[in-house]
Amino acid sequence: EPGHAPVPGGHTISVLGPIPMPLTLCESNFDVQWYACVRNTELGKIQELADDLRAQEGQRSCATLASYMAVNSVMVIGDPESWENPLVRVHSSCLTGDVFGSQRCECGPQMHAALERITEAGGGLLVYMAGHEGRGIGLWAKAATYLLQDGGEDTYQSNESLGLPADSRDFSDAASLLKHFIGGKPFRLLTNNPKKVNDLGEHGVTGITRVKHVTGVSDCNRRYLSAK
């Protein structure tokens, strides 16, 4: 049965899990617990589309259903009952870095290093935000900003050239998931971004200690990181 995490505005997040996820971390095998998380407003759309798909067996409905299945994830490492001050990473999705291994950013190394650091520390969470691609502008717009950056603009200038905000990420769901999984316990947040700490705090998350998380720096992304 899915659990539920409340979200400001009267919504709730359906949390499906735990689902054992075997990973190799710190040169050892671990069964990390994976939870899939989706707002009930989105879950309702998924259920409606699934009913339509069963009735019509239409490829169009199948494609639309898949588009709504990009849900957030929580990876739980260790036993939450034993946590006193766990390590946490709230990670924004980055297809090019996390999946393709692109060195235009440091996202892939940051994600993998976070999992290792959380394991070494005895446990914690990685919250993976699926809707944060390109700091919230989406993959297509991100591709366009890359072309502008190759023409000399930095990561923020390229957003502005497209009429897009520098950072449009919404951390309300991340905050709700942190409160659901950690409760009121203090925790250490792996991030180089003080704004992320402030955004989570504005959504009611307390007890945060920021821990720097510098990794993945290369000649390919030095200009990008300098702008950040």
Regions found by a protein language model. Name each.
Residues 1-228:
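Catalytic domains of riboflavin
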